[in-house]
Amino acid sequence: MGHFNWIQYLTQIEHHYAHVVTAVAVTAFIFVLGIYARVQLGSGEVAVVPAGKFSVRGFFAMVTEGIYTLADQVIGHDGARYVPLAASIFTFVLINNLIGLFPGMTPATDNLNTSFAIGMFSFIYYNYIGLKYEGFNYLKHFLGPVWWLAWLILPIELISHAFRPLTLGLRLAGNITADHTVVGVFHQLFPIGLPVPFYAMGLIVSLIQAFVFALLTLVYVMLAKAHDH
């Protein structure tokens, strides 16, 4: 990306590391928000009382409830154990996406290195879950149900799985780059008034992309666990 970024004023950091700085800053920001939300949550009866207005605690509660419902629908009865993973991915991707709506800020998720890294994390995790719950049987499913077709099914399955983190990363980086480029162009041409609908579109795209990434991660976990049924 060749547009202006406030990080370029940090002379100790080369421009091609801007996405790393943004990702680290977002991670630290989410960590601080999480601690603050935990303090807001309190304990005992206070902890189960819903927040009366929009707050940091309310945001995390909304995300957790939404991801819990999604995990229950996708994975089933034990979907709750994967809520922390999916909610963390959703929050990290969402906040990174939203940062790009601020002038002079470049989201880490429009860089393929970052989005591919998140995809690789999902890839490693769901394969770990498959091996944890099925052991050697998880590897056997790559051969297909018919042994004499294993020579054909194995490369297809391996290629399909190998492309999952890449497609996750490309989808996220491509959509965020395109959306924020459109917002940036219209903001430069018409700095007042007209860019507002495009900012709204950017907000929607940011939400959808974070949701899709979390959803596909849960789907891959479900598929990895499905072979023992």
Model regions: which residues?
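Selective transmembrane helix interface/packing segments
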Residues: M1-H229
